[in-house]
């Protein structure tokens, strides 16, 4: 049961944008892809189709490398990062900590493509039949020279070997200086030993307060 819970922790803390406090095992590859669909009428910001592609690979037991590709602002901004995630302290402790550094680019029709730097800090804690996690980061660009913060807070519960649920609050500062907040409940189905399907909803708490359903596929090799 402990290994099942740890596997779920690793999977969910990896989604949507940051490697979490739990390191990927050495040699393990994780890939997640998905997006939103069935948008509510008028939904544009902060909830849109928002397709994502995310991958992690365990270089060592303490270094996880990955890529993070996504769109934002009604699909008008495309961002891609390569990152390294490094845990701090005891890898078997109940409370886990990690730092994350990333280098990337942002493309938009409003200005030339710019280089980005991102720094992050994560905390996670295993609890009975589940976990808590907080992932924070700040991004700065060579053109947009403002540090823009982001925070995702997640509560997850492992019901059995097949089903897991999560509730995530996503907050941050957008590219146009708007402050956004979204909440996302999700059900995760362990379809095969190396494949999980996550389906849920996203509800904007700011902006036009639009909503959507979301679907993601997670693969582990």
Residue ranges of predicted features:
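Transmembrane beta-barrel domains of Gram-negative outer membranes and organellar outer membranes
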Residues: 18-150, 154-221
